[in-house]
Regions:
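Charged docking surfaces used in two-component/phosphorelay signaling
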Residues: 168, 183-262
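N-terminal Rossmann-like NAD(P) cofactor-binding subdomain of oxidoreductases
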Residues: 1-204
């Protein structure tokens, strides 16, 4: 492991994603947290929003007062990073974005699945972060786009079947994803609160879920994709129903997944 230490800023540090980033970075031997930003909690301690990080000697600062660091991690809502990307690069050589702003390859995809893109010139330089499958592309990347949660669980579930030629891409694929309430974020609203979700199973975006775009881009196939909000807090569990054109044994499946992930 490298002994070099990198300075980092977490933009949007009060949300669930920002809090997890801060926790991971605080415990990482190669990172030093230089700054965490929050417009609503500026000057308050990180522990004010994340009690598990009370021992972290750090206060939130305004995102308008960015410091120069090695890496900026952006844990902001969709649309923020694409608007601020030039500013980010004025303060860091590497940007890791956890929103959907740089996951897709073309402006046309953003027109179809989102509301367009204000910085399409950055899309081709972005590397989709799925370390199990794109690890070799990540070192040295200037712009890293963290994959969507539901797309990640689906891609990891299906990719070994294509690599082992169990699937060719012509088959029907049905994906049913169960997700916890944290997926909606700290400001997810009533639909993500425990009283509203407890004991229920509810489909979310049953038609044209945006994570379908990432799955189709990465695997090159279309899937029938439905996400269900269920009574749990964390996690994304994808059940992928596939229909191979030839018999497949349990041993074939073990070999495919072990070959990909061991």
């Amino acid at each position: 492991m490298s002994s070099e230490t990198y300075s980092a800023t977490v933009i949007g540090g009060t949300g669930f994603t920002g809090g997890e980033l801060l926790r991971l970075l605080a415990g990482h031997p190669n990172f030093e947290i230089a700054q965490a930003t929050s417009r609503s909690k500026a000057n308050k301690t990180v522990g004010h929003s994340h009690p598990n990080l009370r021992e972290l000697d750090l206060r939130f600062s305004s995102p308008d007062d960015l410091e120069s660091v090695d890496v900026i991690f952006a844990a902001t809502p969709h649309g923020v990073s694409m608007e601020q990307i030039d500013t980010f690069y004025e303060h860091a050589d590497t940007v890791v974005d956890l929103s959907a702003d740089f996951r897709l390859n073309t402006a046309e995809q953003y027109e179809e699945w989102y509301d367009g893109h204000s910085a399409p010139e950055y899309l081709k330089k972005s590397v989709y972060a799925l370390p199990e499958l794109t690890r070799d592309e990540l070192p040295g990347a200037d712009l890293i786009a963290s994959g969507g949660c539901n797309a990640t669980s689906t891609i990891l579930g299906l990719k070994p079947l294509f690599d082992a030629d169990i699937l060719s891409g012509d088959e029907d694929i049905v994906v049913d994803v169960k997700v916890g309430s944290s997926e909606g974020g700290a400001g997810g609203g009533a639909a993500s609160s425990h009283p509203e979700r407890s004991g229920i199973v509810r489909p979310y975006a049953p038609i044209s879920h945006r994570h379908e775009a990432e799955i189709e881009q990465f695997l090159g196939v279309s899937v029938s994709f439905t996400v269900h909000a269920v009574d749990m807090t964390r996690g994304s569990s994808a059940t992928c129903h596939v229909f191979p054109g030839q018999p497949v044994s349990k041993g074939d499946l073990w070999k495919a997944y072990r070959g990909s992930y061991e």
